[in-house]
Amino acid sequence: MYQIYVRSFADGNGDGTGDIAGMRSRLGYLRQLGVDAVWINPWYRSPLRDGGYDVADYREINDRFGTTAEAEAFIDDAAEHGIRVLVDLVPNHTSSDHVWFVESLASPAGSDARARYHFLDGRGPGGAEAPNDWQSVFGGSAWSRVADGQWYLHLFDESQPDVNWDHPDVADEFDAVMRFWLDRGAAGFRIDVAHALTKAPGYPDAGLDVNDGKGTLDAVPYLDRDDLHPIVRRWRRVLDEYDDRMMVAEAWVAAGRRPLYLRPDEYHQAFDFDLLAAPWDAKQFRGIIDDSLRAAEAVGSNSTWVLSNHDVVRHATRYGLPAGVEPALWLLDGPHDLLDAERGARRARAAALLTLALPGSVYVYQGDELGLPEAWELPLDVLDDPIWHDSDHSVKGRDGCRVPIPWEPTGPSLGFGKGGTWLPQPPEFAGLAAGAQETDPNSTLLLYRHAIAVRRERLRSGAGLDAGLVWLDVGADVVAFGQADSIRCVVNMGDEPVSLPDGVVLLASGPIAGDQLPPDTAVWLR
């Protein structure tokens, strides 16, 4: 599965912003890469205060990206290339520009229009204090006050009011939105903040002052609640009306809670973010892989591996930082000479071979296949992420992983489009452009293509990937495993070379010296 962040993938009309025309122009590239499907970040009508996750109309395409007719054509064109299309669904909140929220502001307290959201009276004299202590993921209170004195809930930016899933209109509307896109050929949905949706009755204080941005804490009264699962089962019934459709959950929950989202009548997949969040450490990687495979097997699902996405520092940069350095804080505070970019690139290539060898599904964020690093030097005056503003400039935000893709090594936008780019591309992107890598037999792009081709052949032959994983003892700092088709993956995560097991090298993430596997290097053996 290949993730497309529309604004930054390809610009078809030269206005500096990615669009559907640009996406259609790159379908041949995606087919050659070997992807089975693409997940499209929100392309709906939106003021783009949070990159499209503030949806004003779920049935209309943002006119900066194209039209609904173009979206339908993209889905059809992708199918002709053998590529299915998942669309992003944002059910926890709408944009403050959504017709429902506009109506709620024009309606009195206690009205049905306000009941579609979470409007409450405040505490303290004159209701001047927020209804409780809940915090926004982006920083500050999760409540904002409106002109008549009431407060509304927004777990994210104030422009993203949370909808009330206890109101029947909300469930009916999202059923209809799902059918709208399924009728137009969408293969399914990636569900945004799938661990949110419902809130504890009475809106009790959380009782803690915390904002980790991921919602992984236990007993938070607005995250990972058991009463959200009937909503998911209702969605699953909608999908089951159609042939061969799926949902994947973005649920930042503890590993022990993830299987609850993967029961046979709920999600088909849920992202395993534990590997994404793990340091470069063989013991931790082995434990995470074991736990994920075991949990997925218990509910008849499969593991869903991901190393980067549009919300986190790219792994080619994360892996180049010393252990214990928090990437999101390092972006702003540095010191930036801590980064070993070459080491990060080596580890990113090795991690690609590791995940593509594992049973389950693999999600690749656009640019991962080029080895793109985080654009960590973005000037502060170009930052667009609301996290930068809502955190009072204490967190730089996610713009660095959203910089437009370089397609060619030259030109004003490196082949992104005929004009400029909505975020500036760093100088090192030129050497990493897709066009520059096409002719380099040692490039990250060709490594991905070859690895995906081998993976597809293994799936086609029915060998290996569905079989149990067997760990191989190659050393404490090595992740090594094999499967039924005799392909073995060996990843040296230590600081010293290790001896390779016997076998023929099919793929290597870097140069191999005889029978020695260098640090930060992976191989596939037969």
Task: Name the predicted role of every residue range.
Residues 1-502, 508-509, 513-526:
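Active-site and adjacent substrate-binding regions of carbohydrate-active enzymes
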